[in-house]
Amino acid sequence: MASCEVVITGLGIVSPLGIGREAVWERLRAGQSGVRRIPYLVEAGFPVTIGAAVEGFDPRQYVANRKSLKVMARDAQLAVAAAVLACRDAGIAGAVDPDRLGVLLGADRISNPLETCEPTYRACVIEGRFDYRRWGAEGLAATFPLTFLTVLPNMAASHVSIALDARGPSNTLHHGDVSGLLAVVEAARILQRGTADVMVAGGTSSQFTPFDWARHWIMGRLSRREEDPAAAMRPFDASRDGEVRGEGAAAVVLETLTHAQARGARILARVLGWASAYCPPPQQPTDPGLARAIRTALEHAGLEPSEIGLVSAQGAATVDDDMREAHALA
């Protein structure tokens, strides 16, 4: 079974706390927060003006083909950066056959920025009202031809594969908040099946358009605690009142143990066990699926709960979500 063991040898992070794992770790240790006021939300008069944005990010530092930036949503740009950083961290340049290098990413829904949608909207408006009958002719004619390529969830993985010259397995998982974790799991399975020697896996999301903010506000999921942005989101706290929207991407380099040892790689972690399960609708007070997934993952890893040193909970900071998660962890 040693040849089937999967290890992690590289990590790349692009987050509101910084770019690169060293920067993020230092700010975590210092107790810093990536939540702050978002200028365009303040200017637009949104009822919620705080968020966690990635600052100081220049995609041109990570995307070699500058022309491709025109058809890359921010989600894809963040994903490419995280993947490039992970591969640098792992030192796999020239150490892996491109045909045996794969990519698997978890992706979120992608919304077009307002500047892309505005020409289409204006072409369909008559006396202040959107006329759907004009969409097929005037609306499409005013739309940038490659717009739809930017919002396809699988485009992030495609751009990462191109950036890394990864010619092995490539796929995208779109399962909400667990997409990135499931991508890591499926990447490990691909390695164990012998289809690849190295996989780059992770997740990316940038829900920072006005459409995204408005949707989550209407759903009642956003914290209204504006006076102290850093303390607005309070997972599992009695005073929690909602989440804070953010953006970011993370990627890990996974390898079979034999491949990592053969090239003298630094091993950061081992992938021991995993599980997933169906979760009931969010209106339910408990989540037996989450509890079952936790138990099954421990069994798969051959571990007891007492052997776990860290639980990385979702901690959505909504009243119902935190209650269901706390019940499952108990």
Q: What feature does the model see in each segment?
A:
Residues 6-8, 100-104, 196-201, 233, ...:
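Short glycine-aspartate micro-motif
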Residues 8, 23, 29-170, 205-213, ...:
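Conserved beta-ketoacyl condensing-enzyme motif
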Residues 125-143, 185, 189, 193, ...:
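Glycine-/small-residue-rich "gating" segment that lines the acyl/pantetheine channel
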Residues 281-290, 316-330:
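Short glycine/threonine-rich loop-to-helix capping motif typified by GTGT followed
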Residues 79-93, 153-164, 170-205, 244-265:
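Active-site-proximal alpha-helical scaffold in enzymes
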Residues 5-9, 32-37, 227-303, 309-310:
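Condensing-enzyme catalytic core mediating Claisen C-C bond formation in acyl metabolism
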Residues 12-14, 107-110, 175-179, 203-208, ...:
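Acidic, glycine-rich active-site loops and adjacent beta-strand->loop/helix elements
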Residues 1-2, 94-97, 140-141, 149, ...:
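Solvent-exposed alpha-helices and their adjacent loops that cap or buttress functional pockets
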